[in-house]
């Protein structure tokens, strides 16, 4: 999968599916499920590392998890999902050179193909243009931007006329700066629907209604593994309960070495 495929999908009216992964196990599952894009999001700071925000996530941690995600794929590189990784807080806000170094570190040391960053401030637009000149594809992110949590909070954005006009202007600027797609997080559905028609690049929604060019979800939310479930992410599986019950069954077993008599470990099948 390539970035140009996503633009083609928009023209064809094909929904784009984006799921997060944070290690080899999660990426192998997401790949087998058929996602178009795997996002190594800095949300791993909350989902995996136990932080209350994404702000503590470092570039070294993003590289560690991105490499693990890329090692988990089974298919040949040309048939793998597109891998996009987040640039963590303060890895691109402090200047173009630092942003190029951060993005280059992630892409040179993994098979990731693109980076995602938040906002459309003038300094951010300069960073995006510089990255693209260096041959690094960029996905934008507007609406609820978790790296601005102390300024904007974890709440729905673009609720009034001024902020709605700004998000339309920002999306246009991200497109003109060269972004291949934009994530819209936690904004009114009618605004996302209008914005989708306002720009030529794909609009990927999360908590932004169903009328987007695609949807992105945190995999742990879909599987019901998250401790704090977002209001816009309905779980499709009671994952925590299933895992807890399975582990309890093993813990309470009289024979901890017991193997399911109908299953031989040597005959287990891989999705590869």
UniProtKB/Swiss-Prot annotation:
Pathway: Cofactor biosynthesis; (R)-pantothenate biosynthesis; (R)-pantoate from 3-methyl-2-oxobutanoate: step 1/2. Mg(2+) binds at residues 42, 86, 118. InterPro entries: Pantoate_hydroxy_MeTrfase, Pyrv/PenolPyrv_kinase-like_dom, Pyrv_kinase-like_dom_sf. Keywords: Cytoplasm, Magnesium, Metal-binding, Pantothenate biosynthesis, Transferase. GO terms for molecular function: 3-methyl-2-oxobutanoate hydroxymethyltransferase activity; magnesium ion binding. The active site is at residue 185. Binds 1 Mg(2+) ion per subunit. Its cofactor is Mg(2+). It is found in: Cytoplasm. Pfam families: Pantoate_transf. The gene is panB. Belongs to the PanB family. It is an enzyme of class 2 (transferase). Catalyzes the reversible reaction in which hydroxymethyl group from 5,10-methylenetetrahydrofolate is transferred onto alpha-ketoisovalerate to form ketopantoate. NCBIfam families: panB, PRK00311.1. One of its GO terms (cellular component) is cytoplasm. Its main location: cytoplasm. This is 3-methyl-2-oxobutanoate hydroxymethyltransferase. The keyword Cytoplasm applies. It catalyses: 3-methyl-2-oxobutanoate + (6R)-5,10-methylene-5,6,7,8-tetrahydrofolate + H2O = 2-dehydropantoate + (6S)-5,6,7,8-tetrahydrofolate. Homodecamer; pentamer of dimers.
């Amino acid at each position: 999968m390539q970035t140009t495929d996503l633009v083609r999908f928009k023209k064809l009216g094909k929904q784009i599916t984006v799921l997060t992964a944070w290690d080899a196990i999660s990426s192998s599952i997401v790949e087998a499920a058929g996602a178009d894009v795997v996002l190594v999001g800095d949300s791993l700071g909350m989902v995996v590392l136990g932080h209350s925000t994404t702000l503590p996530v470092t570039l070294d941690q993003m590289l560690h998890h991105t490499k693990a995600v890329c090692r988990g794929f089974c298919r040949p590189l040309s048939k793998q999902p597109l891998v996009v990784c987040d640039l963590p807080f303060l890895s691109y806000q402090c200047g173009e050179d630092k942003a190029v170094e951060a993005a280059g570190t992630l892409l040179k040391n993994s098979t990731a193909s693109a980076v995602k960053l938040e906002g459309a401030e003038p300094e951010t637009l300069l960073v995006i243009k510089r990255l693209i000149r260096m041959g690094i594809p960029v996905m934008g992110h507007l609406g609820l931007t978790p790296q601005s949590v102390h300024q904007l909070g974890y709440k729905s954005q673009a609720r009034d006329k001024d902020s709605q006009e700004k998000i339309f202007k920002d999306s246009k600027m991200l497109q003109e700066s060269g972004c291949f797609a934009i994530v819209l997080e936690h904004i009114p559905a009618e605004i996302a629907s209008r914005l989708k028609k306002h720009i030529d690049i794909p609009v990927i929604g999360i908590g932004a209604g169903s009328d987007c060019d695609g949807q992105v979800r945190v995999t742990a939310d879909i599987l019901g593994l998250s401790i704090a479930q977002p209001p816009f992410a309905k779980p499709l599986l009671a994952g925590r309960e299933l895992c807890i019950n399975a582990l309890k069954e093993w813990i309470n077993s009289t024979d901890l070495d017991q193997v399911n008599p109908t299953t031989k470990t040597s005959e287990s099948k891989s999705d590869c």
